[in-house]
Amino acid sequence: MKNNRILAGIAAGVIMVLTLVGCSGNRTGGAEPGTEPVEGSRVGVAMPTQQSERWIADGANVKASLEELGYVVDLQYANDDIPTQVQQIENMITSGARALVIASIDGTTLTDVLQQAKDQNIPVIAYDRLINGTENVDYYTTFDNYEVGVQQATSLLTGLGVLDENGEETGEEGPFNVELFAGSPDDNNANFFWDGAMDTLKPYMDSGVITVPSGQTSFEQAAILRWLPETAQERMENILTVIGDTELDGVLSPYDGLSIGIISALTSGGYSADALPVITGQDAEVGSVKSIIAGEQYSTIFKDTRALGDQAVTMVDSVLKGEEVEVNDTETYDNTVKVVPAYLLESDIVTVDNYEELLVDSGYYTEDDLK
Protein backbone atom coordinates (compact mmCIF):
# COMPACT_ATOMS: atom_id res chain seq x y z
CA MET A 1 0.00 0.00 0.00
CA LYS A 2 2.82 2.33 0.96
CA ASN A 3 4.60 1.59 -2.31
CA ASN A 4 1.39 2.27 -4.24
CA ARG A 5 1.08 5.67 -2.57
CA ILE A 6 4.67 6.49 -3.47
CA LEU A 7 4.14 5.46 -7.10
CA ALA A 8 0.92 7.48 -7.28
CA GLY A 9 2.72 10.53 -5.90
CA ILE A 10 5.53 10.19 -8.41
CA ALA A 11 3.03 9.83 -11.26
CA ALA A 12 1.13 12.92 -10.14
CA GLY A 13 4.37 14.87 -9.94
CA VAL A 14 5.38 13.81 -13.44
CA ILE A 15 1.97 14.80 -14.80
CA MET A 16 2.23 18.21 -13.13
CA VAL A 17 5.72 18.82 -14.53
CA LEU A 18 4.62 17.79 -18.03
CA THR A 19 1.59 20.04 -17.77
CA LEU A 20 3.71 23.02 -16.76
CA VAL A 21 6.20 22.32 -19.54
CA GLY A 22 3.36 22.06 -22.03
CA CYS A 23 1.88 25.36 -20.88
CA SER A 24 5.28 27.01 -21.04
CA GLY A 25 5.77 25.78 -24.60
CA ASN A 26 2.46 27.24 -25.72
CA ARG A 27 3.28 30.62 -24.20
CA THR A 28 6.73 31.20 -25.68
CA GLY A 29 5.61 34.06 -27.90
CA GLY A 30 2.44 35.61 -26.57
CA ALA A 31 -0.77 34.91 -24.71
CA GLU A 32 -4.15 35.22 -26.33
CA PRO A 33 -4.66 39.01 -26.59
CA GLY A 34 -6.70 40.40 -23.74
CA THR A 35 -5.97 37.52 -21.34
CA GLU A 36 -2.91 38.88 -19.51
CA PRO A 37 -1.79 42.24 -18.06
CA VAL A 38 0.11 44.32 -20.61
CA GLU A 39 2.41 46.12 -18.17
CA GLY A 40 5.97 45.08 -18.97
CA SER A 41 4.95 43.14 -22.07
CA ARG A 42 7.49 42.95 -24.88
CA VAL A 43 6.74 44.48 -28.28
CA GLY A 44 8.95 43.94 -31.33
CA VAL A 45 9.36 46.87 -33.72
CA ALA A 46 11.00 46.01 -37.07
CA MET A 47 12.05 48.97 -39.24
CA PRO A 48 13.59 48.65 -42.72
CA THR A 49 16.65 50.90 -42.64
CA GLN A 50 18.62 53.63 -40.93
CA GLN A 51 19.65 55.11 -44.27
CA SER A 52 16.58 57.37 -44.24
CA GLU A 53 16.06 59.87 -41.45
CA ARG A 54 12.31 59.30 -41.52
CA TRP A 55 12.71 55.63 -40.54
CA ILE A 56 15.08 56.54 -37.74
CA ALA A 57 12.48 59.00 -36.45
CA ASP A 58 9.64 56.52 -36.90
CA GLY A 59 11.41 53.87 -34.88
CA ALA A 60 12.32 56.27 -32.10
CA ASN A 61 8.77 57.66 -31.91
CA VAL A 62 7.11 54.23 -31.72
CA LYS A 63 9.60 53.01 -29.13
CA ALA A 64 9.19 56.06 -26.90
CA SER A 65 5.39 55.98 -27.07
CA LEU A 66 5.22 52.27 -26.27
CA GLU A 67 7.60 52.71 -23.35
CA GLU A 68 5.42 55.49 -21.97
CA LEU A 69 2.62 52.92 -21.73
CA GLY A 70 4.85 50.50 -19.86
CA TYR A 71 5.90 48.20 -22.69
CA VAL A 72 9.40 46.81 -23.17
CA VAL A 73 10.45 47.50 -26.76
CA ASP A 74 12.81 45.56 -29.02
CA LEU A 75 13.55 48.00 -31.88
CA GLN A 76 15.55 46.67 -34.83
CA TYR A 77 16.67 48.11 -38.18
CA ALA A 78 17.50 45.73 -41.03
CA ASN A 79 19.62 47.97 -43.30
CA ASP A 80 17.33 47.16 -46.23
CA ASP A 81 18.42 43.50 -46.13
CA ILE A 82 15.49 41.08 -46.32
CA PRO A 83 17.13 38.05 -44.63
CA THR A 84 18.25 40.31 -41.80
CA GLN A 85 14.72 41.56 -41.23
CA VAL A 86 13.32 38.02 -41.27
CA GLN A 87 15.93 36.94 -38.71
CA GLN A 88 15.18 39.95 -36.52
CA ILE A 89 11.47 39.14 -36.50
CA GLU A 90 12.19 35.49 -35.70
CA ASN A 91 14.33 36.62 -32.77
CA MET A 92 11.53 38.88 -31.54
CA ILE A 93 9.13 35.94 -31.59
CA THR A 94 11.45 33.59 -29.72
CA SER A 95 12.32 36.34 -27.22
CA GLY A 96 8.70 36.53 -26.11
CA ALA A 97 7.24 39.47 -28.02
CA ARG A 98 3.49 39.75 -27.49
CA ALA A 99 2.96 42.02 -30.51
CA LEU A 100 4.89 42.99 -33.63
CA VAL A 101 4.99 46.32 -35.47
CA ILE A 102 6.60 45.79 -38.88
CA ALA A 103 7.63 48.23 -41.59
CA SER A 104 8.64 45.68 -44.20
CA ILE A 105 11.47 45.96 -46.70
CA ASP A 106 9.66 43.72 -49.16
CA GLY A 107 6.05 43.10 -48.23
CA THR A 108 5.97 39.75 -50.02
CA THR A 109 8.77 38.02 -48.10
CA LEU A 110 7.38 37.60 -44.58
CA THR A 111 4.82 34.81 -45.05
CA ASP A 112 6.76 32.10 -43.22
CA VAL A 113 7.92 34.20 -40.29
CA LEU A 114 4.44 35.63 -39.77
CA GLN A 115 3.06 32.11 -39.62
CA GLN A 116 5.42 31.63 -36.69
CA ALA A 117 3.91 34.72 -35.09
CA LYS A 118 0.40 33.41 -35.69
CA ASP A 119 1.30 30.08 -34.10
CA GLN A 120 2.30 31.99 -30.95
CA ASN A 121 -0.85 34.19 -30.91
CA ILE A 122 1.23 37.29 -31.67
CA PRO A 123 -0.77 40.07 -33.41
CA VAL A 124 0.96 41.88 -36.27
CA ILE A 125 0.57 45.56 -37.15
CA ALA A 126 1.85 46.53 -40.61
CA TYR A 127 3.44 49.96 -40.31
CA ASP A 128 3.19 52.30 -43.31
CA ARG A 129 4.00 49.49 -45.78
CA LEU A 130 1.44 46.78 -46.43
CA ILE A 131 2.52 43.18 -45.87
CA ASN A 132 1.31 41.05 -48.78
CA GLY A 133 0.51 37.41 -49.42
CA THR A 134 -0.45 36.35 -45.90
CA GLU A 135 -3.52 36.23 -43.71
CA ASN A 136 -1.33 36.73 -40.66
CA VAL A 137 -1.33 40.50 -40.59
CA ASP A 138 -4.01 41.90 -38.33
CA TYR A 139 -4.02 45.66 -38.91
CA TYR A 140 -2.36 48.29 -41.04
CA THR A 141 -1.70 51.95 -40.35
CA THR A 142 -0.45 54.32 -43.02
CA PHE A 143 -1.29 57.52 -44.83
CA ASP A 144 -3.74 57.77 -47.70
CA ASN A 145 -1.07 56.79 -50.20
CA TYR A 146 -3.15 57.31 -53.32
CA GLU A 147 -3.85 60.85 -52.11
CA VAL A 148 -0.13 61.37 -51.52
CA GLY A 149 0.41 60.64 -55.21
CA VAL A 150 -2.36 63.06 -56.14
CA GLN A 151 -0.70 65.72 -53.98
CA GLN A 152 2.68 65.14 -55.62
CA ALA A 153 1.22 65.56 -59.09
CA THR A 154 -0.87 68.53 -58.01
CA SER A 155 2.18 70.32 -56.61
CA LEU A 156 4.04 69.61 -59.85
CA LEU A 157 1.21 71.11 -61.89
CA THR A 158 1.09 74.11 -59.55
CA GLY A 159 4.83 74.64 -59.86
CA LEU A 160 4.53 74.52 -63.65
CA GLY A 161 1.72 77.08 -63.56
CA VAL A 162 -0.90 74.69 -64.97
CA LEU A 163 -2.87 74.95 -61.72
CA ASP A 164 -3.13 77.92 -59.38
CA GLU A 165 -2.72 77.76 -55.61
CA ASN A 166 -6.37 76.75 -55.27
CA GLY A 167 -5.99 73.84 -57.68
CA GLU A 168 -7.86 75.58 -60.48
CA GLU A 169 -6.63 75.40 -64.07
CA THR A 170 -4.92 78.57 -65.28
CA GLY A 171 -5.28 77.89 -69.01
CA GLU A 172 -1.53 77.38 -69.41
CA GLU A 173 -1.05 74.94 -72.28
CA GLY A 174 2.70 74.28 -72.21
CA PRO A 175 3.98 72.00 -73.52
CA PHE A 176 6.07 71.22 -70.45
CA ASN A 177 8.81 68.62 -70.53
CA VAL A 178 8.52 66.37 -67.47
CA GLU A 179 10.31 63.18 -66.44
CA LEU A 180 8.72 60.62 -64.13
CA PHE A 181 10.17 58.67 -61.20
CA ALA A 182 8.50 55.99 -59.10
CA GLY A 183 9.33 54.24 -55.85
CA SER A 184 10.61 50.76 -55.14
CA PRO A 185 8.61 48.00 -56.87
CA ASP A 186 8.75 45.83 -53.73
CA ASP A 187 7.04 48.55 -51.67
CA ASN A 188 3.26 48.34 -51.99
CA ASN A 189 2.95 52.07 -51.32
CA ALA A 190 4.94 52.91 -54.43
CA ASN A 191 2.10 51.69 -56.62
CA PHE A 192 -0.43 53.84 -54.77
CA PHE A 193 1.80 56.92 -55.10
CA TRP A 194 2.24 56.23 -58.81
CA ASP A 195 -1.44 55.59 -59.46
CA GLY A 196 -2.50 58.77 -57.67
CA ALA A 197 0.06 60.84 -59.53
CA MET A 198 -0.59 59.35 -62.96
CA ASP A 199 -4.36 59.58 -62.65
CA THR A 200 -3.81 63.29 -61.99
CA LEU A 201 -1.25 63.88 -64.74
CA LYS A 202 -2.70 61.68 -67.48
CA PRO A 203 -5.29 64.18 -68.78
CA TYR A 204 -2.51 66.73 -69.25
CA MET A 205 -0.26 64.15 -70.89
CA ASP A 206 -3.06 63.12 -73.24
CA SER A 207 -3.77 66.73 -74.20
CA GLY A 208 -0.11 67.56 -74.80
CA VAL A 209 0.25 70.04 -71.94
CA ILE A 210 2.83 67.64 -70.48
CA THR A 211 5.27 65.61 -72.53
CA VAL A 212 7.82 63.03 -71.36
CA PRO A 213 10.91 63.47 -73.58
CA SER A 214 12.46 60.10 -72.66
CA GLY A 215 9.23 58.26 -73.44
CA GLN A 216 9.60 56.35 -70.17
CA THR A 217 6.06 56.47 -68.82
CA SER A 218 5.50 53.06 -67.23
CA PHE A 219 5.92 52.24 -63.56
CA GLU A 220 8.50 49.59 -64.42
CA GLN A 221 10.62 52.13 -66.30
CA ALA A 222 10.33 54.78 -63.61
CA ALA A 223 10.76 52.58 -60.51
CA ILE A 224 13.81 52.95 -58.26
CA LEU A 225 14.60 49.76 -56.34
CA ARG A 226 14.94 50.27 -52.56
CA TRP A 227 14.32 54.01 -53.04
CA LEU A 228 18.08 54.53 -53.41
CA PRO A 229 19.16 58.14 -54.16
CA GLU A 230 22.22 56.98 -56.10
CA THR A 231 20.02 54.86 -58.38
CA ALA A 232 17.76 57.85 -59.02
CA GLN A 233 20.80 59.99 -59.76
CA GLU A 234 22.11 57.42 -62.23
CA ARG A 235 18.74 57.16 -63.98
CA MET A 236 18.45 60.96 -64.22
CA GLU A 237 21.95 61.13 -65.71
CA ASN A 238 20.98 58.50 -68.29
CA ILE A 239 17.81 60.40 -69.16
CA LEU A 240 19.78 63.61 -69.68
CA THR A 241 22.02 61.73 -72.09
CA VAL A 242 19.03 60.34 -73.99
CA ILE A 243 17.14 63.63 -74.33
CA GLY A 244 20.19 65.69 -75.25
CA ASP A 245 19.57 69.44 -75.37
CA THR A 246 15.87 69.17 -74.47
CA GLU A 247 15.30 71.33 -71.41
CA LEU A 248 13.27 69.87 -68.58
CA ASP A 249 10.51 71.84 -66.88
CA GLY A 250 9.64 69.34 -64.16
CA VAL A 251 10.44 66.02 -62.50
CA LEU A 252 7.90 63.94 -60.62
CA SER A 253 9.81 62.47 -57.68
CA PRO A 254 7.96 60.37 -55.08
CA TYR A 255 10.53 60.70 -52.27
CA ASP A 256 12.95 63.34 -50.97
CA GLY A 257 15.93 61.00 -51.08
CA LEU A 258 15.35 60.47 -54.79
CA SER A 259 14.88 64.21 -55.26
CA ILE A 260 18.33 64.90 -53.83
CA GLY A 261 19.86 62.39 -56.25
CA ILE A 262 17.90 63.89 -59.15
CA ILE A 263 19.07 67.41 -58.26
CA SER A 264 22.68 66.20 -58.14
CA ALA A 265 22.34 64.76 -61.63
CA LEU A 266 20.73 67.92 -62.96
CA THR A 267 23.34 70.29 -61.51
CA SER A 268 26.13 68.03 -62.78
CA GLY A 269 24.38 68.01 -66.15
CA GLY A 270 24.45 71.77 -66.56
CA TYR A 271 21.40 73.09 -64.70
CA SER A 272 22.13 75.91 -62.27
CA ALA A 273 20.84 75.57 -58.71
CA ASP A 274 18.57 78.60 -59.15
CA ALA A 275 17.08 77.41 -62.46
CA LEU A 276 16.17 73.80 -61.78
CA PRO A 277 12.99 72.13 -63.05
CA VAL A 278 10.01 71.85 -60.71
CA ILE A 279 10.91 68.85 -58.53
CA THR A 280 8.54 67.17 -56.09
CA GLY A 281 9.24 64.86 -53.14
CA GLN A 282 7.88 63.18 -50.05
CA ASP A 283 8.62 62.88 -46.31
CA ALA A 284 9.75 66.45 -45.58
CA GLU A 285 13.28 65.32 -44.76
CA VAL A 286 15.58 68.02 -43.43
CA GLY A 287 17.83 68.09 -46.49
CA SER A 288 14.91 68.53 -48.85
CA VAL A 289 13.20 71.16 -46.72
CA LYS A 290 16.46 73.12 -46.76
CA SER A 291 16.54 72.62 -50.53
CA ILE A 292 13.00 73.99 -50.79
CA ILE A 293 13.97 77.02 -48.72
CA ALA A 294 16.98 77.53 -51.01
CA GLY A 295 14.74 77.47 -54.09
CA GLU A 296 15.99 74.15 -55.49
CA GLN A 297 13.42 71.43 -54.77
CA TYR A 298 9.92 72.81 -55.28
CA SER A 299 7.79 70.74 -52.90
CA THR A 300 7.53 67.75 -50.61
CA ILE A 301 4.72 65.89 -48.91
CA PHE A 302 4.59 66.12 -45.11
CA LYS A 303 3.43 62.94 -43.46
CA ASP A 304 3.49 63.54 -39.73
CA THR A 305 5.14 60.34 -38.55
CA ARG A 306 4.41 61.31 -34.96
CA ALA A 307 0.73 60.71 -35.70
CA LEU A 308 1.55 57.49 -37.57
CA GLY A 309 3.56 56.21 -34.63
CA ASP A 310 0.83 57.16 -32.18
CA GLN A 311 -1.73 55.25 -34.25
CA ALA A 312 0.44 52.13 -34.36
CA VAL A 313 0.94 52.30 -30.60
CA THR A 314 -2.79 52.75 -30.04
CA MET A 315 -3.46 49.66 -32.17
CA VAL A 316 -0.93 47.59 -30.21
CA ASP A 317 -2.33 48.72 -26.88
CA SER A 318 -5.93 48.07 -27.91
CA VAL A 319 -5.32 44.61 -29.34
CA LEU A 320 -3.27 43.44 -26.35
CA LYS A 321 -5.94 44.66 -23.97
CA GLY A 322 -8.60 42.84 -25.97
CA GLU A 323 -10.27 46.11 -26.93
CA GLU A 324 -11.74 47.09 -30.28
CA VAL A 325 -9.10 48.46 -32.64
CA GLU A 326 -10.13 51.65 -34.43
CA VAL A 327 -9.90 51.54 -38.23
CA ASN A 328 -11.29 53.82 -40.94
CA ASP A 329 -10.72 51.74 -44.09
CA THR A 330 -11.84 48.16 -44.63
CA GLU A 331 -11.84 48.10 -48.44
CA THR A 332 -8.64 49.47 -49.96
CA TYR A 333 -5.72 47.37 -48.81
CA ASP A 334 -6.05 43.91 -50.34
CA ASN A 335 -2.83 41.96 -49.79
CA THR A 336 -3.96 39.19 -52.21
CA VAL A 337 -5.07 36.97 -49.32
CA LYS A 338 -7.25 39.34 -47.30
CA VAL A 339 -8.32 42.94 -47.08
CA VAL A 340 -6.34 44.26 -44.14
CA PRO A 341 -8.31 46.64 -41.89
CA ALA A 342 -6.47 49.94 -41.89
CA TYR A 343 -6.31 53.37 -40.34
CA LEU A 344 -5.35 56.07 -42.86
CA LEU A 345 -3.92 59.45 -41.94
CA GLU A 346 -3.81 62.66 -43.96
CA SER A 347 -0.81 64.42 -45.50
CA ASP A 348 0.04 67.97 -46.64
CA ILE A 349 1.85 69.60 -49.55
CA VAL A 350 4.84 71.63 -48.34
CA THR A 351 6.37 74.49 -50.32
CA VAL A 352 8.49 77.50 -49.43
CA ASP A 353 5.26 79.38 -48.71
CA ASN A 354 3.99 77.15 -45.89
CA TYR A 355 6.90 75.13 -44.49
CA GLU A 356 7.08 77.28 -41.35
CA GLU A 357 3.40 76.78 -40.54
CA LEU A 358 3.39 73.04 -41.21
CA LEU A 359 6.80 72.01 -39.97
CA VAL A 360 8.07 74.58 -37.48
CA ASP A 361 4.89 75.83 -35.84
CA SER A 362 3.76 72.21 -35.36
CA GLY A 363 6.98 71.39 -33.53
CA TYR A 364 8.09 68.80 -36.08
CA TYR A 365 11.28 70.78 -36.68
CA THR A 366 12.87 73.76 -34.99
CA GLU A 367 14.13 76.76 -36.92
CA ASP A 368 17.67 75.68 -36.08
CA ASP A 369 17.03 72.27 -37.67
CA LEU A 370 16.42 73.99 -41.00
CA LYS A 371 19.37 76.40 -40.99
Language-model-detected regions and their locations in the chain:
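Sec-dependent N-terminal signal peptides
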Residues: 5-15
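A residue-level marker of the well-folded mature domains of exported/periplasmic proteins
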Residues: 2-5, 23-371
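C-terminal motif of bacterial Sec signal peptides marking the signal peptidase cleavage site
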Residues: 18-22
